[in-house]
Swiss-Prot record:
One MF annotation (Gene Ontology) recorded for this entry: tRNA binding
Catalytic activity as recorded in UniProt: adenosine(2503) in 23S rRNA + 2 reduced [2Fe-2S]-[ferredoxin] + 2 S-adenosyl-L-methionine = 2-methyladenosine(2503) in 23S rRNA + 5'-deoxyadenosine + L-methionine + 2 oxidized [2Fe-2S]-[ferredoxin] + S-adenosyl-L-homocysteine; adenosine(37) in tRNA + 2 reduced [2Fe-2S]-[ferredoxin] + 2 S-adenosyl-L-methionine = 2-methyladenosine(37) in tRNA + 5'-deoxyadenosine + L-methionine + 2 oxidized [2Fe-2S]-[ferredoxin] + S-adenosyl-L-homocysteine
Record-listed [4Fe-4S] cluster binding positions: 109, 113, 116
Uppermost EC category: transferase
UniProt cross-references to CDD domains, sorted A to Z: Radical_SAM
Record's protein name: Probable dual-specificity RNA methyltransferase RlmN
Other known facts: Reaction proceeds by a ping-pong mechanism involving intermediate methylation of a conserved cysteine residue.
PANTHER family per UniProt: 23S RRNA METHYLTRANSFERASE (PTHR30544), RADICAL SAM CORE DOMAIN-CONTAINING PROTEIN (PTHR30544:SF5)
Organism: Thermus thermophilus (strain ATCC 27634 / DSM 579 / HB8)
PROSITE patterns from the UniProt entry: RADICAL_SAM
HAMAP family: RNA_methyltr_RlmN
Compartment list: Cytoplasm
Amino acid sequence: MAASHALKPILELLPEELPGEGYRRAQIAHWLYAKGARDFSEMTDLPKALREALAREWRLSEFSLVQAFPSQDGSVKYLFTLLDGKKTEAVYMPYENRKTVCLSTMVGCPAGCTFCATGALGFGRNLTAAEILDQLLTIAYHQGLSPREIRNVVLMGMGEPLLNLRNVLKAVRIMLHKKALALSPRRVTLSTVGIPKGIYRLAEEDLGVRLALSLHAPDDETRRKIIPTAHRYPIAEIMEAVRHYHAKTKRRVTFEYTLLKGVNDHLWQARLLAKLLKGLSAHVNLIPFNPWEGAPVVGTPRAGVLAFAEELKRLGVPTSIRWSRGQDVGAACGQLALKVPRPLTLTPLPGGAGR
């Protein structure tokens, strides 16, 4: 069946909201989230009449085209064409002890961070909960996995999740639902540039997911140079919200910090960062800048990255360096820009919506 906006997105529904009687809903949820069915005809323990009725009313996929770009390090970037023709991206990252996906929450991003290729695209639109979830389901299908074999989700792709909070919360609830993806809350990380109102709301929802703050500078003056929209929310206001989130959820907060040469990589800034985080259960993720065409900034050399990390550790701040994966296909942190990597060959996936 061809993709059609006339069909309703079944991935928008919690398991208890799925069509059919109680036990039929459980069967449909099992097919969607445990077996990864991509067509209603695959749901062979449902009556044929029900399968046909589902196919007439609902769609299983939110994409008209999916393309995959494998990296030499084993990660894979996915480019999704949505039903309205707009595009977004996600990344699959297999590790020895876990399989992780980095999902997008928007087409483009309104934050405009200077180091981020997505920000240079500007804002397209919010993704629906179904479009967020289907990134994971489609990646699992492509990798020959059950969706439940992907046990780590980071909402760190395109977009600012807290500016699409309604749809993001719906998607996360389905990820955590025992009859859906059954993810542990501590295996879901939501990354934000720092929207205080959204952080408070996330705390009140009490989902228990991990929070990552894209801080990138310990002072407002420097941060405004890196994040043009940072003038709306002073660091003190953001930190007050973050401390509330930590107090409410008891979850350690991660602080993302992309190091830019001569901008935010001075050792005095490391000391100021340590002072800012004092008394908070926090972990700093230092991110070496991943270059992209037209970027207005330059990354800190490796020696500078290591020196900044050592200064933070000396001051008692738990710190790690995230050496990004997928750089050769534009899949690394800050590189998602809807670019088609060359000379790698596209890998179209079967079908689209209503397969």
